[in-house]
Design a protein with these regions (language model features):
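Active-site and adjacent substrate-binding regions of carbohydrate-active enzymes
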Residues: 2-541
Length: 541
């Protein structure tokens, strides 16, 4: 079934990402859950979002934050039950919100029934659901490394074979070359679609067509074939939003994956802009200042290359990234102004914007003692770098800037104990600034960051130029300003953002003369000669 523009509801949509563990606890155990999300649907409807992307809630031993799924048709008891999930899907619909699930199709948990069967014998019908190679103990089939370190091969002495895993040993890779695996996956997706799920985010989806013997782990030769079959057998049977996480995608691949003919996915997540503030050739912990002109160039490249032949996802934050207002804004003196500027800058672009929980409040990074962090990546890095001779101060500076727990502190609902997240002891400490930064203080304040996001969500629905306007980068070489225009047959929009904390002359005064200000982050926009610190203006005519 081809999907015409009317059916592509996600082009006008804004998606809200929820990290369930940290969103809202309903039973006092300190962990967020599905009933907690149901309790907060009114808040999300007020914001105006159209879909919720739920980070993994499937049954899982939680070796990798739920990205190790042991049962694709059940919910992890931490978050509730299958009944709770069905209730969330149905209640969200009443608020005009669809639910997107976070689906891992590259690998399962080693606790999954398929894998438990697969390792019993080479003749087991599930054996070929995974990738096995013969070998002697201690002599793996190759020296390939897993993404999280160590060998990509794990020995099972009972059958004298190694299985392949690109991530943890607890995450054996599924064998997509086996048509039975693909059929089982499609049946599972259709089962969720029957329950009313409105879309899927597909984790590391560009790694499913791996060929370990040839050392191919990403963008394998059969990738397009698998994508098209997956879409044909499942997604095209419903009007779904689908986003493929593709760390290895350039714009050419992204055009294939998000082809307007609807044969693969609605859009992709690409991360080219996300690694800019780290040293060349280093890890994310090796901090560097943001090369501002390069950021502009990369974002413009994705806007222009995918115009009319693909679709962008627009995001600053997710559950793995630091808070954008602390990262590229100013979370002290200009927190409100810089948070709004970053929102206006991103939401004026073409694509589907993603708001990560708390981003709409300007939630900030945290600075904890090492004992208070929960993320295994942070803890492992801390010990590794101490051994390598880094100073504790250096290491903590990197953790404060880039640690994943920055995104995972509990949602700040109000100024009561634990920010209204739980009546118990939260699984991770609440940010100390919850008494000043919280939803309760912002929802009814017309000048709040929340109200800025709410207005941006509505503007995308009201003005077609947000969806179909052609993007042109302006002032490409300007060291302080990120400006661009969007133009369709009816309207021209100009977005001008001062990215830094100094007042500067407004270089586009003539171009913007006589245009209406759609949204800005300062009340008075009558002075066309200067831009104040972090000032953002969106003009239209």
């Amino acid at each position: 079934m081809s999907r015409n523009n009317n059916e592509k509801w996600w082009k006008k949509a804004v998606v809200y990402q929820i990290y369930p563990k940290s969103f809202q606890d309903s039973n006092g155990d300190g962990f967020g859950d599905l009933q907690g999300i149901i309790k907060r649907l009114d808040y999300l409807e007020t914001l105006g979002i159209n879909a919720i992307w739920l980070s993994p809630v499937f049954k899982s031993p939680q070796a990798d934050n739920g990205y190790d799924i042991s049962d694709y048709r059940d919910i992890d008891p931490t978050f509730g039950s299958l009944d709770d999930m069905e209730e969330l899907i149905n209640e969200a619909k009443k608020h005009n919100i669809r639910i997107m699930m976070d689906l891992v199709l590259n690998h399962s948990s080693n606790e999954h029934r398929w894998f438990k069967e697969a390792k019993k014998s080479k003749d087991n019908p599930y054996h070929d659901y995974y990738i096995w190679r013969d070998g002697d103990e201690g002599v793996p089939p190759s020296d390939m490394k897993a993404c999280f370190g160590g060998s990509a091969w794990e020995y099972v002495p009972e059958i004298g074979q190694y299985y392949f895993h690109q991530f943890l040993p607890e995450q054996p890779d599924l064998n997509w070359e086996n048509p039975k695996v693909r059929r089982a996956i499609y049946d599972m997706i259709l089962w969720w679609m029957d329950k009313g799920v409105g879309g899927f985010r597909l984790d590391v989806i560009d790694q499913i067509a791996k060929e370990p013997d040839k050392r191919i782990t990403i963008n394998g030769p059969r990738l397009q074939e698998y994508f098209k079959e997956l879409s044909r057998e499942t997604f095209q049977k419903g009007n779904l939003i689908t986003v493929g996480e593709a760390w290895g995608a350039d714009t050419e691949r992204a055009k294939l994956y998000s082809n307007p003919d609807g044969s693969e996915f609605s859009m992709v997540f690409q991360f080219e802009h996300i690694g800019l503030d780290q040293k060349e050739g280093g890890e994310k912990w090796d901090l560097a200042s943001l090369p501002f002109k390069k950021l502009k160039k990369i974002m413009a490249h994705w806007q222009n290359e995918l115009y009319n032949c693909g679709w962008n996802s627009l995001f600053w934050d997710n559950h793995d990234l630091p808070r954008i207002v602390s990262r590229w804004g100013n979370d002290r003196e200009y927190r409100v102004e810089s948070a709004k500027m970053l929102a206006i800058l991103l939401h004026g672009m073409q694509g589907t914007p993603y708001i990560y929980q708390g981003e709409e409040l300007g939630m900030t990074n945290v600075q904890y003692d090492i004992e208070d962090y929960k993320d295994c990546e942070i803890i492992n890095m801390y010990h590794e770098r101490l051994e390598k001779g880094y100073s504790k101060d250096e290491i903590m500076k990197s953790i404060y800037a880039k640690g994943r727990d920055n995104a995972r502190t509990p949602m700040q609902w109000d100024d009561s104990a634990n920010a209204g997240f739980t009546t118990g002891t939260p699984w991770i400490k609440v940010n100390d600034n919850y008494d000043k930064i919280n939803a309760k203080s912002q929802v009814d304040d017309p000048d709040s960051i929340f109200s800025c996001y709410k207005k941006l969500v509505q503007l995308r629905k009201d003005y077609p130029v947000f969806v179909d306007g052609k993007f042109t980068l302006l002032l490409e070489d300007d060291e302080n300003i990120f400006a661009y225009s969007r133009k369709n047959e009816e309207k021209t929009m100009i977005v001008v953002c001062n990215f830094f904390d100094k007042e500067i002359p407004m270089p586009l005064a003539k171009e913007c003369e006589g245009m209406e200000v759609l949204i800005s982050n300062y009340k008075d926009t009558s002075d066309m000669s200067v831009l104040r610190p972090y000032e953002a203006r969106m003009y239209i005519r």
